UniProtKB/Swiss-Prot annotation:
Domain spans labelled F-box: 68-111
SMART domains: Sec7
GO cellular component, one term: ubiquitin ligase complex
Keywords: Guanine-nucleotide releasing factor
InterPro entries: F-box-like_dom_sf, F-box_dom, FBXO8_F-box, Sec7_C_sf, Sec7_dom, Sec7_dom_sf
Gene: FBXO8
Domain of life: Eukaryota
UniProt keyword Cytoplasm, yes or no: no
Protein name per UniProt: F-box only protein 8
C-alpha cells in the first residue's frame, strides 16, 4: 500500500516537471542510435590500418555471393594456407566453386609437397597427362589404403609410379609425411627392417642432448607399448646413430654405443617412474645416478644428473 502511494506521488511529480513516457522512449532511442554511430566509427578506425585486406574480404562479385569470401581475390599465399587445412574430399568440393584455383598446378604442387614432402615422382620427368591435382588425390588414396593395410598402401604407391621399389625411397616418404597412422607404421617397420635402417639414418642428432634426441626419434618411429625385441632393436639403432652424429662428444664423455644403449633404457624406465600415477615412491635423483653408474661405468655423475633433470622437467622420452 505504501509503495503504491509512493509511485502515484512520484508520477505526479514527474508530470509536473514535464516528464512523459513518450518523451522518455524518444530520448532512449536517440541515445542508442548515437552509441551505434560511435561504435561504427571506432570500427572503421580500427580497420583503417589494414584497409586493403578489409576491402578484399568484403568484396563480392554479385549479391548472390554476399557472405561468401572468394579465395581467388585473396593473395595466393593466403589461399594456399586456407586450402591446406582441407582434406581431399573438401578440396574437390572447393574446386567446383573456385574454377581458376582448381586448375592452378602450382597450388596443387604446393599442397602435395607440403603434405607429402618426398615422393620418387617429384624427381622424374612427368608422364603424359600428369597433373599435381590428380597426384594429390592418388597420394590421399594411398595414405588411406596404408592406414588400413600398410603393404597394400605401399604397393598402391608403387603401382601409380609415385614411389620406387627401394627401401631408401620408402623411408624418405615415411620420414616426410604425417598422414600415416603410427600404429600401422609401427607394424610395417617391424616387418620391413631394411626400411627401418634407412629411416634411422635420415635422423640428424648432431649437438642434441640425449633425452631430446630420443624424444625426436620416438616422434618419428613410435615405441611399442610393451618391452620386447622390437624395442631393443629401436634403441640399438638409435644408439649407433646418436654416436655417429656426435663423435666428438662421445670421445669427450667416453661413451660407446653400448653405454648409450644403457642410458636410453635408464631414461625410459625413469620416464615411466616419474610420470606414472601408479608409482607412488618416485625415484630420487641420487638413486638414478647410483643405479645408472652401476650399470654403465665411467659415466660422469654430473652428466647423469643432467639426464635426470631433463626427464623431471620436460617429461617422458617416448610419450
Amino acid at each position: 500500500m505504501g509503495q503504491g502511494l509512493w509511485r502515484v506521488v512520484r508520477n505526479q511529480q514527474l508530470q509536473q516537471e514535464g516528464y512523459s513516457e513518450q518523451g522518455y522512449l524518444t530520448r532512449e532511442q536517440s541515445r542508442r542510435m548515437a552509441a551505434s554511430n560511435i561504435s561504427n566509427t571506432n570500427h572503421r578506425k580500427q580497420v583503417q590500418g589494414g584497409i586493403d585486406i578489409y576491402h578484399l574480404l568484403k568484396a563480392r562479385k554479385s549479391k548472390e555471393q554476399e557472405g561468401f569470401i572468394n579465395l581467388e581475390m585473396l593473395p595466393p599465399e593466403l589461399s594456399f594456407t586456407i586450402l591446406s587445412y582441407l582434406n581431399a574430399t573438401d578440396l574437390c568440393l572447393a574446386s567446383c566453386v573456385w574454377q581458376d584455383l582448381a586448375n592452378d598446378e602450382l597450388l596443387w604442387q604446393g599442397l602435395c609437397k607440403s603434405t607429402w614432402g618426398h615422393c620418387s615422382i617429384y624427381n622424374k620427368n612427368p608422364p603424359l597427362g600428369f597433373s599435381f591435382r590428380k597426384l594429390y588425390m592418388q597420394l590421399d588414396e594411398g595414405s588411406l589404403t596404408f592406414n588400413a593395410n600398410p603393404d597394400e598402401g605401399v604397393n598402391y604407391f608403387m603401382s601409380k609410379g609415385i614411389l620406387d621399389d627401394s627401401p631408401k625411397e620408402i623411408a624418405k616418404f615415411i620420414f616426410c609425411t604425417r598422414t600415416l597412422n603410427w600404429k600401422k607404421l609401427r607394424i610395417y617397420l617391424d616387418e620391413r627392417r631394411d626400411v627401418l635402417d634407412d629411416l634411422v639414418t635420415l635422423h640428424n642428432f648432431r649437438n642434441q642432448f640425449l633425452p631430446n634426441a630420443l624424444r625426436e626419434f620416438f616422434r618419428h618411429i613410435h615405441a611399442p607399448e610393451e618391452r620386447g625385441e622390437y624395442l631393443e632393436t629401436l634403441i640399438t639403432k638409435f644408439s649407433h646413430r646418436f654416436c655417429a652424429c656426435n663423435p666428438d662428444l662421445m670421445r669427450e664423455l667416453g661413451l660407446s654405443p653400448d653405454a648409450v644403449y644403457v642410458l636410453c633404457y635408464s631414461l625410459i624406465l625413469l620416464s615411466i617412474d616419474l610420470t606414472s600415477p601408479h608409482v607412488k615412491n618416485k625415484m630420487s635423483k641420487r638413486e638414478f645416478i647410483r643405479n645408472t653408474r652401476r650399470a654403465a661405468q665411467n659415466i660422469s655423475e654430473d652428466f647423469v644428473g643432467h639426464l635426470y633433470d631433463n626427464i623431471y622437467l620436460i617429461g617422458h622420452v617416448a610419450a
